[in-house]
Amino acid sequence: MESSSKGLLTQVTQFWNLLDDLAESNPESYQKFIQQQLKEGKELCAAPEPQLCLQTRILKPKEKLLFINLCQWKRIPAPESATHPVPLSIGRPEDISETSDVYTVIDVAYHPDVLQAAEKDQVKKDQLIRMAMRCIEEQFQFTLSNCYYVTKFRIKGSIQRMKQNLMGIQTNPADLREKMRNELTLEKIRSSTVSNSDQFPQLLLPEDQVSSKTACLIEEISSTEIKVEMKRPAYELKIVADQNEKPLKIELKVELPGVNSVSLCDLSVSEDDILIEVSEKYRLYLNLPESVDTEMTTAKFIKEKATLIVTMPLV
């Protein structure tokens, strides 16, 4: 133990000597180095921030309402390229009771660049959401509904709860001091840095071309989501008004020949757009002419006509 401490002290002394030499020989490089370390340290310590919240349902093992908070966190590594896996971090499920409502909340974090890129591309945004849902299913052995919608609020629950969940913050100061006293060694500080993206679960966003070196599971994900060319179905979109010609709702009728069940349809609605997908058959994405109330949106499937009707009240 004593020799280990001496060895560590020697390494620290050598490191400071190198910094002193650098400061004397090349002050500009020394300044850049210090600024870079401060920047990386700040990013490493930065807390996750809520980006958007999804509502869906857990079907198995027990049916429950589920909210997924998608957060941006600089501590999560960014993917090396468009064909590399996308790292993400998933917090533990938390069951929350509010009066008569009981629901589950799961926090998911991506690197900020990943979410910002998805905000500009609805297709990538949907892929990112569905990959997060798939990762949740695999990690917790859940079966989730294929349908989801983006809520009006960015986070379900408090920001403090989300930070504690993702960052593992201990709220008891005495426990935190004891943990630091027992575990805060230089080696553990080094190992806790997030320079290695293997520490996080990773998924691949589908691209037209995927590297042959990608893992088998990732190749399967890509092949099922991008290599099948889906048709754009015929549809009718109209705004329904009242007797005074005041717009009330948007009604969308979509013809889906060959589809005989609503369970085959994936429907995603936000205030400004709608996405309808039928696996390996149809895909329809539309920007809506008016903002709609996602919580009051309804959908029904007329089996005889193979037609999906979505009714979206205006905000």
Swiss-Prot record:
One of the record's GO cellular component terms:
cytoplasm
Tell me a GO biological process for this protein. box C/D snoRNP assembly
Which InterPro entries does this chain map to? PIH1/Kintoun_subfamily, PIH1_N, PIH1D1/2/3_CS-like
> By its UniProt entry, which Pfam families does this protein fall under?
PIH1 (PF08190), PIH1_CS (PF18201)
Domain of life of the native organism: Eukaryota
Question: What protein family does this chain belong to?
Answer: Belongs to the PIH1 family.
Q: What is this protein called?
A: PIH1 domain-containing protein 2
Give the gene symbol: PIH1D2
